[in-house]
Amino acid sequence: KGQRLYISINGGSSWNETQPAGNNDITWQAAAASNDGKYLMAAAKDGRLYISTTSGTNWQETQPAGNADQPWQICSMSGDGKIMLAGIYGGRVYLSTNYGGSWKEAF
């Protein structure tokens, strides 16, 4: 069975489940958030990466590596959410400098 992803918009006083992949059973590997919680990123072991620019209300799948054949190991973002990093198993790291709008291989 997959895992669930939860977000808090009040400093952890309460939590709500969010479903980036709909009702699919996903094993989540990593997650990141901007300081204000508006920008979110969730990395799945099955090779999918999701971004929200609406505090988790809506999610969009993105493929920085061009395909979903490698599991994501780590993701991170700057405090304002503009700069995002995502790394896949095997050592490649991808960078976005426009809130996840486009990606390039960083190293």
Please place each PLM-identified region on the residue numbering.
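Conserved Ser/Thr-centered positions that define the repeating blades of beta-propeller domains
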Residues: S8-I9, S34, S52-T53, S78, ...
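A short loop-to-beta-strand structural motif that recurs across blades of beta-propeller domains
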Residues: Q3-I7, G47-I51, G91-L95
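Beta-rich catalytic cores
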Residues: T27, P71
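Short loop/turn motifs that cap or connect beta-strands within the blades
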Residues: E17-N23, E61-N67, E105-F107
